[in-house]
Design a protein with these regions (language model features):
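Active-site-proximal catalytic alpha-helix in oxidoreductases
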Residues: 190-218, 222-235, 261-263
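NAD(P)+-binding Rossmann beta1-loop-alpha1 motif at the extreme N-terminus of oxidoreductases
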Residues: 1-56
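NAD(P)-dependent Rossmann-like dehydrogenase/reductase catalytic/cofactor-binding core
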Residues: 177, 226-329
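Rossmann-like NAD(P)(H) cofactor-binding subdomain of soluble oxidoreductases
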Residues: 56-145
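Ferredoxin-like iron-sulfur electron-transfer modules
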Residues: 326-343, 360-380, 395-399
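Iron-sulfur cluster-binding cysteine motifs and their immediate structural context
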Residues: 346-363, 383-399
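Rossmann-fold dinucleotide-binding core
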Residues: 74, 110-192, 196, 202
Length: 399
């Protein structure tokens, strides 16, 4: 099966790598030429920490075909869409030459609403959608720190229910399963997608607004009450769409697992709002609940308020308050804990002043050794400590 991945960031390139391991002929489509070259040689490396002692498991390198545009590419059997929801329409327009009459389009993007955008240009019989129980961070070009959780790692269904759709769905799931992860095609996909939406509603936008990691926010009483209010609104809207969700089941079986896996991380929307200053997926998460609630005549005041706050932040990144003292440079000190640092390198990637760098060689875990190279250049922006998944970095202000 010839498959192209639109949006080969951390999640897209991980899924593409697994599809190739399962026997598919995969092409990754990325914006940056240098990243496409890294995907090709030496290839993608997927690594994860397992066990209490932080043992590392590693797959790869996996040489991948990659391109920055679709010129010269054949029509694909399938296209996996992994861009942000706000980029779905433009991504499909750019990929028009590789989408034929029988090409299947699969979206495993966050939230609800992407299938409607895809259906504007693609026959509904060829549209598949679902969600993933996986995580990935690209700590260096073509190097992924990954995690798998849940009983099934990739679950998806189709807009049109029929024998042809089931046949393709089972074939695609078989490719994923052959790679070593668990995948399934189901006709009850809306339940899975809505439960995943609840996970995102409970942590994503809220963490960005209060500037906390998932675990930190989840331990706060008022944040939890806010999340519960948003969840109850979403469940009411889901019922209006014919999807029956169990609040108690979600709170006792799904949310604890999600919090455990994301406790030390900033959710994707928080990263967009705090570090990247980038467009978020609010319209496909809380905004989707707001939009569908209006259509069904169901009030969603909490999700609406959160959506409005996020939109306000997005429109005004360049006007946000900044502590003027953060420009004094030498008055800030960066300290890295050797005990907690696992060497993912994410802090190096996001430091705007290149205060942090990698030493020659690897640390005891076989990862990057991070060091402070230019202490005096630190502006106290907290980007490094914000993105550190192990809370290994502290920034102190010196008198």
């Amino acid at each position: 099966m010839k498959i192209a991945v639109l949006g080969a960031g951390a999640m897209g390139s991980m899924l593409g790598a697994y599809l190739q391991l399962g026997g598919a002929d995969v092409t990754l489509l990325v914006r940056r030429k240098e990243l496409a070259e890294k995907f090709g040689a030496p290839g993608i490396v997927m690594r994860s920490y397992t066990g209490a002692d932080g043992e590392k498991t590693e797959i790869g390198p996996i040489p991948m075909k990659a391109a920055t545009d679709c010129s010269g590419l054949d029509v694909m059997d399938a296209v996996l869409v992994m861009v942000k929801g706000c980029d779905t329409k433009s991504a499909l327009t750019g990929a028009a030459s590789i989408i034929g009459e029988n090409t299947k389009i699969i979206t495993l993007q966050n939230g609800i609403g992407n299938t409607d955008i895809i259906a504007e240009s693609v026959n509904k019989d060829n549209i598949y959608y679902g969600c993933v129980n996986m995580s990935a961070i690209m700590s260096a070009p073509a190097v992924l720190d990954t995690g798998l959780f849940g009983d099934v790692n990739v679950v998806f269904g189709s807009v049109t229910k029929g024998e042809d759709q089931k046949k393709f769905g089972d074939e695609l799931a078989g490719i994923f399963n052959a790679s070593g992860i668990k995948a399934a095609y189901t006709e009850d996909i809306d339940t899975e997608v809505w439960y995943k939406l609840l996970v995102n509603i409970s942590v994503n936008a809220g963490c960005g607004l209060v500037r906390l990691r998932g675990g930190e926010a989840g331990n706060d009483q008022d944040f939890t009450l806010l999340a519960v209010d948003m969840l109850k609104e979403a469940i009411a809207v889901a019922y209006s769409c014919g999807v029956k969700l169990d609040f108690n089941y979600f709170m006792t079986h799904i949310l604890p697992v999600a919090r455990k896996t994301s406790g030390l991380h900033y959710p994707s929307m928080a990263q967009d709002m705090l570090m990247k200053k980038a467009p978020t997926e609010i319209e496909f998460i809380n905004g989707a609940v707001e939009r569908l609630g209006k259509k069904a005549g169901i009030p969603t005041p909490v999700n609406q308020t959160v959506s409005r706050l996020v939109r306000t932040i997005e429109r005004n990144y360049d006007k946000q308050y900044q502590d003027k003292s953060a420009k004094s440079g030498p008055s800030f000190k960066v300290k890295i804990s050797d005990k907690f640092c696992k060497g993912c390198g994410y802090c190096i990637k996001y430091c705007p002043k290149k205060v942090l760098t990698a030493e020659d060689g690897l640390n005891a875990k076989g990862y990057v050794k991070v060091k402070v190279a230019n202490q005096g250049d630190c502006i106290g922006c907290l980007q490094c400590s914000t993105v550190c998944p192990e809370a290994a970095i502290t920034i102190s202000k010196e008198d």
